[in-house]
């Protein structure tokens, strides 16, 4: 489980496909100049959110962190758009006693969305996303949504489009700074919205 508060940015160093995919990631500090020492305490088998995708750490070698990515994960997320040099958001899993600064995030990507526009407004950024119509019912104004692993508040919604505001700190400390029009992002729906929809279906069936 995660909170959607990004601690570091990772850079894809290699992508290898045999049956599934293997990726290696270097964890970089916010100044992009050095490996983040805080990640050297990770143990093999640990869960790490990589742009909102919960992946299992399988190997650490030469300051690179290796993960496997299955076909199921690749087909349901934006993974197939990742390339060497691609920046991703990184969050270690939540521990008992940690501060919950965002909302509960599970690392289970529901769908993807496309960046429609990015507007800078006095140092902050307004980003509009186009998402799959089947999931629009889960996006509510002032509700929570996870975009590439980041816990955010929905500012406005209109049909299949919703927008969020990104403050300067979040922009500079996440992979959002590399977004362009047409970028594909991972979306995780707030778990409360999913359960409410399930309860509503059960109620209607009865």
Language-model regions, residue ranges each:
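Conserved loop->alpha-helix
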Residues: 1-206
């Amino acid at each position: 489980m995660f909170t959607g508060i990004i601690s570091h940015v990772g850079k894809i160093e290699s992508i290898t496909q045999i049956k599934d995919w293997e990726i290696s990631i270097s964890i970089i500090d916010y100044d992009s100049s050095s490996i983040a020492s805080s990640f050297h305490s990770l143990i093999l088998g640990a869960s790490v959110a990589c742009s909102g995708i919960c992946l299992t750490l399988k190997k650490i070698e030469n300051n690179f962190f290796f993960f496997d990515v299955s076909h199921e994960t690749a087909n349901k997320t934006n993974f197939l758009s990742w390339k060497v040099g691609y920046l991703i958001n990184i969050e270690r899993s939540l521990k008992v006693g940690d501060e919950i600064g965002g909302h509960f995030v599970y690392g289970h990507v529901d769908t993807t969305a496309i960046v429609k526009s990015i507007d800078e407004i006095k140092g902050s950024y307004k980003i509009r996303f186009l998402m799959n119509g089947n999931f629009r019912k889960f996006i509510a104004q002032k509700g929570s949504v996870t975009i590439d692993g980041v816990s955010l508040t929905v500012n406005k919604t209109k049909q299949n489009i919703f927008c969020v505001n990104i403050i300067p700190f979040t922009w500079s400390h996440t992979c959002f700074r590399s977004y362009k029009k047409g970028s594909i992002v991972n979306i995780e729906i707030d778990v409360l919205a999913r359960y409410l929809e399930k309860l509503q279906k059960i109620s209607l069936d009865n």
